[in-house]
C-alpha cells in the first residue's frame, strides 16, 4: 500500500483542510491516509475548540482512513518539537511512504534546502545565528536572519525579500521543521507540499468567497454564533460542531491564575519561562482579567503571544523539566482515535511492520509517561469543556467509521 501521512489539528475542520486532504491524495497517488492529530490541547497553547473525538469524526467523514493522536507534550510545544513528535510517530509506523503538508510558498525544493542547512549547521551559519541571538532576537527570528545571510554569502539565487517572507510564515516554518525531522531521523518518507490558499494562517476575519483560517472560524464561534461559520466548513463538520460544546478560555484563565497564585514556583519548572518572564507573569497575573489581557501585558520582542500562550498552557497542565525532556525521543506508542475499513487494513500493516505499541483501549495499555500525561490533559480539559467527562480516555473507544 502507498500510504500518505498528514499532520493536523482540525481545530475545527474547514474547507481549507478538505482541499489539503483531497490534494494530498492526488499529489501522492496514495491508497490510504494516516492523520496525526493534536488531542485536546493544540500547538498555540490553547484547549482545542472541541474535543479530539468530535474532531476525529470530522476527519473520518472527510476521507481520512486512520486518525492517531499526537501526544499532548509534543502538541503543545514549539514548531520544532511539534514537528519532531508527529514525523517521528509516522516514521515509527513503518508503513508511511509520503508526508504531505501545506505551506505558504508551495516550494518543496526550497523547504528541503533550508531544512538541510539548519540540520547540518555549517560553521558560518552557526556563527551568524550566535551573533543574532546576542543581539537579543528571539530564536526563530535570529535563525531566519542567519539563514538569509548564509545563503547570500553562498550566492544562492533567490529574491531575499521573498525569502524573508517565506521564513516568517507560520506554515512554512512548520514545513521546514517537518523536513528537518525527516533528515534527523534519516527517514525514507518522501515530503510533498501544497501551497496554502485563502486567508493567512493567523487571519481572524471571515471573508466571503475566500477559504477562512481556523483562527477566524474559532473567533467567529466564540464571539458571535456558529451559523456565521457555515459557509467556511463542510456540512458534516458544521453539524458535528452544532451538536457539541466548546472549550471555555475564561475557565482556563481562572485555572492558570489559581496555579500561579497558589504556587509561583510552578513557572520555574518550565525552561521556556526564563530570562525574567516568570517574574513578569507573576507581577501581571493580578492585573489581568483574561488570558488575552495577561499575555498582552507580558509579551515582548523575545516572548511572542503564542510562546507565552504555550508557557501558560504548560502551567495549566503542570508540566515539569522531566516531562519536557521526553520530547527528545520518539513516542513509543501510537494512540488510535478512529478508523474506517481501509484504516483497519492499515492497522494490520502497522502490526506486521512495526514494533510500536498500538493503544486501542487504555485499560490494556502499558504504563507510559507520555500516555499518562495525555490522560491528565483530557481530565483537565474536562474542566474547560462540559462535553468531556473525567476519565473519558478510558470510557471512549476509537471511532469506527463505516
UniProtKB/Swiss-Prot annotation:
Keyword terms, alphabetized: ATP-binding, Cytoplasm, Ligase, Nucleotide-binding, RNA-binding, tRNA processing, tRNA-binding
Stored InterPro entries: Rossmann-like_a/b/a_fold, tRNA(Met)_cyd_acetate_ligase
Main location per the UniProt record: cytoplasm
Binding site for ATP: 7-20, 102, 171, 196
Subcellular location: Cytoplasm
GO terms under cellular component: cytoplasm
Reaction(s) catalysed (UniProt annotation): cytidine(34) in elongator tRNA(Met) + acetate + ATP = N(4)-acetylcytidine(34) in elongator tRNA(Met) + AMP + diphosphate
GO molecular function, one term: ATP binding
Main enzyme class: ligase
Entry EC number(s): 6.3.4.-
Coiled coil: none
Record's signal peptide: none
GO biological process: tRNA modification
Sequence similarity: Belongs to the TmcAL family.
Database matches in PANTHER family: TRNA(MET) CYTIDINE ACETATE LIGASE
Purpose: Catalyzes the formation of N(4)-acetylcytidine (ac(4)C) at the wobble position of elongator tRNA(Met), using acetate and ATP as substrates. First activates an acetate ion to form acetyladenylate (Ac-AMP) and then transfers the acetyl group to tRNA to form ac(4)C34.
Stated name of the protein: tRNA(Met) cytidine acetate ligase
Organism classification: Bacteria, Bacillati, Bacillota, Clostridia, Eubacteriales
Amino acid at each position: 500500500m502507498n500510504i500518505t501521512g498528514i499532520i493536523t489539528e482540525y481545530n475545527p475542520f474547514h474547507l481549507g483542510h478538505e482541499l489539503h486532504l483531497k490534494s494530498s491524495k492526488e499529489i501522492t497517488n496514495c491508497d490510504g491516509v494516516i492523520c496525526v492529530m493534536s488531542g485536546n490541547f493544540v500547538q498555540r497553547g490553547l484547549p482545542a475548540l472541541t474535543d479530539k473525538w468530535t474532531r476525529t469524526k470530522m476527519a473520518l467523514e472527510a476521507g481520512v482512513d486512520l486518525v492517531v493522536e499526537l501526544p499532548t507534550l509534543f502538541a503543545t510545544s514549539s514548531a520544532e518539537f511539534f514537528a519532531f513528535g508527529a514525523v517521528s510517530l509516522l516514521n515509527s509506523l513503518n508503513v508511511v511512504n509520503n508526508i504531505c503538508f501545506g505551506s505558504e510558498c508551495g516550494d518543496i525544493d526550497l523547504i528541503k534546502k533550508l531544512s538541510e542547512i539548519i540540520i547540518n549547521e555549517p560553521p558560518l551559519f552557526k556563527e551568524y545565528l550566535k551573533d543574532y541571538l546576542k543581539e537579543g532576537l528571539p530564536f526563530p527570528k535570529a535563525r531566519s536572519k542567519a539563514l538569509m545571510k548564509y545563503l547570500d554569502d553562498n550566492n544562492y539565487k533567490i529574491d531575499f525579500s521573498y525569502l524573508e517572507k517565506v521564513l516568517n510564515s507560520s506554515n512554512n516554518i512548520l514545513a521546514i521543521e517537518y523536513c528537518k525531522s525527516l533528515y534527523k531521523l534519516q527517514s525514507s518518507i518522501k515530503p510533498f507540499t501544497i501551497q496554502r490558499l485563502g486567508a493567512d494562517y493567523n487571519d481572524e476575519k471571515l471573508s466571503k468567497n475566500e477559504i477562512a483560517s481556523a483562527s477566524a472560524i474559532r473567533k467567529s464561534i466564540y464571539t458571535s454564533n456558529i451559523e456565521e461559520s457555515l459557509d467556511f466548513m463542510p456540512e458534516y463538520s458544521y453539524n458535528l460542531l452544532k451538536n457539541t460544546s466548546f472549550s471555555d478560555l475564561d475557565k482556563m484563565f481562572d485555572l492558570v491564575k489559581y496555579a500561579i497564585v497558589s504556587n509561583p514556583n510552578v513557572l520555574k519548572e518550565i525552561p521556556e519561562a526564563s530570562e525574567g518572564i516568570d517574574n513578569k507573569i507573576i507581577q501581571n497575573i493580578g492585573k489581568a482579567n483574561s488570558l488575552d489581557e495577561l499575555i498582552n501585558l507580558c509579551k515582548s520582542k523575545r516572548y511572542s503571544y503564542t510562546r507565552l500562550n504555550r508557557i501558560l498552557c504548560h502551567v495549566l497542565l503542570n508540566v515539569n523539566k522531566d516531562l519536557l525532556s521526553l520530547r527528545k525521543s520518539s513516542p513509543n506508542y501510537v494512540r488510535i482515535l478512529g478508523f474506517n475499513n481501509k484504516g483497519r487494513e492499515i492497522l494490520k500493516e502497522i502490526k506486521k511492520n512495526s514494533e510500536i505499541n498500538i493503544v486501542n483501549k487504555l485499560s490494556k495499555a502499558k504504563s507510559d509517561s507520555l500516555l499518562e500525561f495525555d490522560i491528565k490533559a483530557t481530565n483537565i480539559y474536562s474542566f474547560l469543556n462540559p462535553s468531556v467527562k473525567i476519565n473519558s480516555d478510558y470510557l471512549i473507544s476509537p471511532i469506527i467509521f463505516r
